[in-house]
């Protein structure tokens, strides 16, 4: 026999990941819409509420959950600060609402006055209970209604106001609560960030190793292009032992800089530095601090690469050999992915008997850079490290730094990528690079944005990386670079680009592999930062449109549209009255003509009236009416970004808005 019980049952609370085992994700300013099935035997009325608090606060915030249909109730709350929010559903039998419903039927059924008076007395008794728990103002109103009931005023018993007062203050009869669920709230940049990756050693106009002070001189250009996160590959000393040469050659020449991912090497004074040191040729930690300060002054966040692996020259190798794998002969095992061998790095053994000290030290790597102004990180291959480590590490870090944003670089199996997101990674690389047809992109978009994955997995679309130059970019050249950039920047609300080779349309692959020739991972390159033929103006315009249109700053409203052409993809996004439709050609060689089919009613557009279609990308204005609209895209113009709104509002309103934005 149970010690306590309730007639009320709460089930199917959503959103909840794996029954509430993992938090859902939101960004600051977003809504959490909660639904629950709430049942009671018989015909009693229910009161259902959503109870929410930030984990750092004791105060709970309560909102009603109205009945929707079929015993389902719905409510919502907005998250306004980074960190953890806790929410639960509670419900109880609303005895006054039950009484009021029955009383209304008695009145409408014409029951005799004596019965009505008797029922009013019962209703007054319920209000008495509510008045005992009400503050003074509400108690006075309840007392006035009690007097009206006692005087036989049936009309006073039927109002919504008295029902709400009773619901708010009456004892919660047979109350029960759901389990408590968690929302992790990210800073806004986790939802809207535009990442720009570059190698700081390659910013000079000659082939000499640059400093971070010289790299900082490039930051205004990146800011002018509309990016808000500057991502640097590892900036640490690079090992000399088994250093890789150009294009991953097994041996390096005396002047080859090596791969930044071979972390751990010699500092200017001859000592060894690792994950908490800056390469001496970059200028040391002082230069890094100046770089961060310059970035922050420009409104840019700095993201650092965290790669938990060590070159043979890393101080950990001498100080903690127990943290690494050993061969039978006692030597340290280097990294391998047969048949590939990476002799310039040693993988870390997370299962070492000394794992508590190892884990604490690796967590302190993040803490060191947080102390130097960095709260955004990209983690290299997190899927090759234990899930338990990431769950512990990320949660510990966020106790003191809730604004932390961590991007998972895990090109691996979908379930593994999703699990890393559940563990606490804010963003993740995706398969976007390999989705190159409208059908493939639409199917992938539906999976990411319209399934349960959208509650916790935030995709970050990258058209290229230092490791990946897809054949589509090679074959499609400049048109493909433009179309893939528009797709990345508008289909997802957060995206990134490995900047210099992308904006300069570098299409030279190494040995016909999906990799850049003369890869910057292994050598210093020079770029013409002022090249008038680069994609810089195009990229800047797309980023400006992202910043000006709230619809492009989220993914939940995306809807794929029919174009009646196999090489055209179209989708809409909406936020309030900001309605955007993007159309992109995936044929970089030919002109494509199609018909954009708009679901007028679903998009909130007038069925029988004209509306404005402003192509923001090319500043062209059209007046449309109806559902079908002619499209023609070409290699020179492979994309449209339309803003749709009632005719007569676009040109004047947004000309004024644009003047304000760019003043």
Swiss-Prot record:
- For region Disordered, the annotated ranges are 238-266
Site feature Transition state stabilizer, where: 467
Q: Which domain of life is it from?
A: Bacteria
Q: Which InterPro entries match?
A: GlgE, GLGE_C, GlgE_dom_N/S, Glyco_hydro_13_cat_dom, Glyco_hydro_b, Glycoside_hydrolase_SF, Ig-like_fold
Assigned EC number: 2.4.99.16
Q: Give the record's keywords alphabetically.
A: Carbohydrate metabolism, Glycosyltransferase, Transferase
Q: What class of enzyme is it?
A: transferase
In its UniProt record, a GO molecular function of this protein is:
hexosyltransferase activity
Q: Which family does it belong to?
A: Belongs to the glycosyl hydrolase 13 family. GlgE subfamily.
Functional summary from the UniProt entry:
Maltosyltransferase that uses maltose 1-phosphate (M1P) as the sugar donor to elongate linear or branched alpha-(1->4)-glucans. Is involved in a branched alpha-glucan biosynthetic pathway from trehalose, together with TreS, Mak and GlgB.
Protein name per Swiss-Prot or TrEMBL: Alpha-1,4-glucan:maltose-1-phosphate maltosyltransferase
| Protein source organism | Salinibacter ruber (strain DSM 13855 / M31)
């Amino acid at each position: 026999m149970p010690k306590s019980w309730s007639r009320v049952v709460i089930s199917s609370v959503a959103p909840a990941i794996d029954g509430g085992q993992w938090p859902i994700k939101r960004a600051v300013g977003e809504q959490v819409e909660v639904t629950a099935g709430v049942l009671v035997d018989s015909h009693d009325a229910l009161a259902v509420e959503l109870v929410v608090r930030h984990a750092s606060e004791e105060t709970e915030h309560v909102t009603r959950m109205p009945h929707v249909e079929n015993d389902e109730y719905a409510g919502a709350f907005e998250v306004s600060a980074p960190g953890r929010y806790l929410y639960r559903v509670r419900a109880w039998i609303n005895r006054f609402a039950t009484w009021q419903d029955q009383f209304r039927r008695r009145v409408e059924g014409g029951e005799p006055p004596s019965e009505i008076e008797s029922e009013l007395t019962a209703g007054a008794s319920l209000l008495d209970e509510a008045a005992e728990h009400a503050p003074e103002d509400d108690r006075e109103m309840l007392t006035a209604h009690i007097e009206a009931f006692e005087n036989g005023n049936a009309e006073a018993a039927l109002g919504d106001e008295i029902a709400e007062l009773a619901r708010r203050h009456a004892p919660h009869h047979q109350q029960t609560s759901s389990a408590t669920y968690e929302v992790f709230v990210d800073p806004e940049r986790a939802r809207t960030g535009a990442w720009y990756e570059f190698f700081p050693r390659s910013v000079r106009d000659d082939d000499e190793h640059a400093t971070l002070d010289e790299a900082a001189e490039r930051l205004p250009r990146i800011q002018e292009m509309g990016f808000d996160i500057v991502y640097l590959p590892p900036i640490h000393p690079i090992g000399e032992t088994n250093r890789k040469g150009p294009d991953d050659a097994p041996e390096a020449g005396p002047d080859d800089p090596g791969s930044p991912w071979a972390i751990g090497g010699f500092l200017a004074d001859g000592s060894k530095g690792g994950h908490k040191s800056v390469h001496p040729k970059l200028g040391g930690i002082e230069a890094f601090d100046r770089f961060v300060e310059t970035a922050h002054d420009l409104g840019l966040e700095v993201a650092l690469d965290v790669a938990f692996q060590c070159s043979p020259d890393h101080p950990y190798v001498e100080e903690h050999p127990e943290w690494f794998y050993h061969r039978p002969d006692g030597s340290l095992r280097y990294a391998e992915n047969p048949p590939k061998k990476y002799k310039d790095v040693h993988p870390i053994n997370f299962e070492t008997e000394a794992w508590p000290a190892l884990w604490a030290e690796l967590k302190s790597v993040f803490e060191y850079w947080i102390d130097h102004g960095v709260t955004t990180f990209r983690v290299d291959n997190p899927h090759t490290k234990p899930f338990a480590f990431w769950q512990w590490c990320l949660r510990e870090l966020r106790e003191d730094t809730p604004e932390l944003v961590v991007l998972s670089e895990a090109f691996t199996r979908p379930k593994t990528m999703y699990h890393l997101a559940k563990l606490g990674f804010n963003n993740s690389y995706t398969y976007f690079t390999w989705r190159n047809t409208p059908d493939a992109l639409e199917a992938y978009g539906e999976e990411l944005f319209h399934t349960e994955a959208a509650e916790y997995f935030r995709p970050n679309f990258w058209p290229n990386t230092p490791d990946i130059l897809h054949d589509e970019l090679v074959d499609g050249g400049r048109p493909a670079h433009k179309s893939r950039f528009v797709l990345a920047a508008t289909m997802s609300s957060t995206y990134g680009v490995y900047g210099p080779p992308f904006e300069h349309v570098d299409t030279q692959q190494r040995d016909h592999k999906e990799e850049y020739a003369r890869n910057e991972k292994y050598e210093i390159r020079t770029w013409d930062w002022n090249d008038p033929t680069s994609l810089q103006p195009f990229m800047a315009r797309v980023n400006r449109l992202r910043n000006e249109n709230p619809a492009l700053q989220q993914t939940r409203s995306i809807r794929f549209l029919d174009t009646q052409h196999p090489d055209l993809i179209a989708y809409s996004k909406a936020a309030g009255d900001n309605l955007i439709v993007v159309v992109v050609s995936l044929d970089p060689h030919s002109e494509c003509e199609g018909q954009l089919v708009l679901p007028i009613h679903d998009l909130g557009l007038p069925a029988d009236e004209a509306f404005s279609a402003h192509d923001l990308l090319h500043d062209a204005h059209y007046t449309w009416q109806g559902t079908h609209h002619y499209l023609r895209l070409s290699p020179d113009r492979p994309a449209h970004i339309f803003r749709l709104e009632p005719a007569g509002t676009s040109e004047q309103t947004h000309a004024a808005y644009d003047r304000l934005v760019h003043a």
